[in-house]
A protein has these predicted regions:
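Beta-propeller-forming repeat regions
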Residues: 1-340
Length: 340
C-alpha cells in the first residue's frame, strides 16, 4: 500500500533525527501525487540506499538515499559529522531524458569515470559524484543489474542490465559513457539476468538472461546455443528430491534440477574456493529451497555440500521474495573468499 502520511525520518548513530531538525529540504516529502499511477501498488514508495565515497577514498563516505525508479527519481546524498546530518546534494529527475523512469530494483556504486570518486549507477542512468546526471540510455526500468570489470580487455568498468519494456531485452554497456556494447532483444518483460565469471574457458564474465536461453561471453559471443539449451530442457526428466523432514509437508514439491542446460539467473556466489563464481539456485514453489549450482562449461550441476546433501537439506532453509529466491544475507563472514 502507498504510505499516505509518515513524517520522514533518517537515522544517525544511535539517535533519530526528525525531519525539520537537520534534514529540512532533504528527502522529498510524501504526497499522493507521484506520476505513473503513483498510488498504484507501491510505485511511489520504492526506496533504495547505498554508501558511496563521493569525495574519494581519502574522505568519509556519504549515505545515498533514493526514492522512486518507475517514474520520478530522487537521490539524496547526506553526510554525518558526528552530531548531525548534512545534505551534500539532492538529485531530482522528474522529466524524460534524465534518470526519470530509468531505475532498477537495486543500485550500483563504483567509480565509473576514473576520477577517484564513486558514482551511482541507477539502472539505465548514472548520477555523477556531484549529484548531476552523468548519462541516461533511455532504455528504462529493469529487474537486475551488475557493475564491474566484466570485460578485462576494455578500460574501465562495464554494466549489464535487463529491461522490463519491450523490446529492449538485455545489454552490456560502457559504465562511464552509457555506450551499448552489445544487446539482445526480447518480445516481453526480461525479468531475470545475471553476469558472473562461471567459465574459465572464456575471458571475463559470462552473461545470460530470461529473454532467451543463451550464455554469452563478455564480447557478446554465444557460448551456449539457445536451440541446444531448449532441446535439452524439453527432453529432460525432472529430478525429484525426497521431501524434507520436520517442518516440510510431504505433499509439497521440493524438486530441483540436478543438471540444468542453463545456469540459474538469480544470484552468483563464491562457494567452493576456486576462481570462478558459483550460482545460488532455487527449487520449486512454495518455498523455493536454495541450492548451489556449478557450471562445468556445458551445463549447470547441483553442487552438494561436503556431507553429500544439498543446501536446502540443512536446517530446512528456504528463500524469500518468491521467484527471485532472495537470501536474507549472503556474505563472506570469515574472510576465506567463500560466502555464507
Amino acid at each position: 500500500h502507498t504510505i499516505w502520511y509518515n513524517p520522514n525520518r533518517a537515522f544517525g548513530v544511535g539517535r533519530q533525527v526528525a525531519e525539520g531538525e537537520s534534514l529540512k529540504d532533504g528527502f522529498p516529502a510524501y504526497s499522493s501525487v507521484w506520476g505513473d499511477k503513483g498510488n498504484y501498488g507501491n510505485r511511489g514508495e520504492r526506496y533504495l540506499a547505498g554508501v558511496a565515497f563521493l569525495d574519494g577514498k581519502d574522505h568519509l563516505p556519504s549515505a545515498v538515499m533514493c526514492r522512486g525508479y518507475y517514474t520520478r527519481s530522487y537521490l539524496w546524498a547526506v553526510d554525518f559529522d558526528g552530531k548531525q546530518l548534512k545534505t551534500k546534494w539532492l538529485h531530482a529527475s522528474t522529466t524524460s531524458g534524465t534518470a526519470y523512469a530509468q531505475g532498477a530494483h537495486s543500485l550500483a556504486v563504483g567509480d565509473v569515470d576514473g576520477d577517484g570518486c564513486d558514482e551511482i549507477t541507477y539502472g539505465s542512468a548514472a548520477i555523477n559524484n556531484d549529484g548531476t546526471l552523468l548519462y541516461s540510455t533511455g532504455l528504462g526500468h529493469g529487474d537486475a543489474q551488475h557493475l564491474g570489470d566484466l570485460d578485462p580487455d576494455r578500460p574501465g568498468l562495464e554494466y549489464f542490465m535487463v529491461h522490463e519494456e519491450y523490446p529492449y531485452g538485455s545489454d552490456l554497456r560502457d559504465a562511464k559513457t552509457g555506450e551499448i556494447l552489445y544487446r539482445t532483444l526480447d518480445r516481453d518483460d526480461t525479468g531475470r539476468g545475471l553476469a558472473a565469471d562461471i567459465d574459465a574457458n572464456h575471458r571475463g564474465y559470462e552473461m545470460w538472461s530470461s529473454d532467451n536461453p543463451e550464455v554469452r561471453d563478455c564480447k557478446g559471443n554465444v557460448i551456449v546455443e539457445a536451440k541446444d539449451a531448449w532441446k535439452k530442457r524439453s527432453g529432460e526428466k525432472k529430478k525429484k528430491q525426497a521431501p524434507q523432514q520436520g517442518d516440510w509437508n510431504s505433499n509439497e514439491k521440493t524438486t530441483f534440477r540436478a543438471v540444468s542446460p542453463m545456469p540459474a539467473m538469480n544470484f552468483r556466489i563464491y562457494w567452493d574456493g576456486d576462481l570462478q563464481d558459483e550460482l545460488l539456485a532455487n527449487g520449486r514453489a512454495p518455498h523455493f529451497p536454495p541450492y548451489i549450482q556449478k557450471w562445468n562449461g556445458k551445463e549447470a550441476v547441483a553442487l552438494p555440500l561436503s556431507n553429500g546433501k544439498q543446501l536446502f537439506e540443512m536446517g530446512h532453509s528456504v528463500s524469500c521474495n518468491w521467484t527471485k529466491a532472495t537470501p536474507n544475507l549472503q556474505a563472506d563472514l570469515f574472510g576465506d573468499w567463500r560466502e555464507e
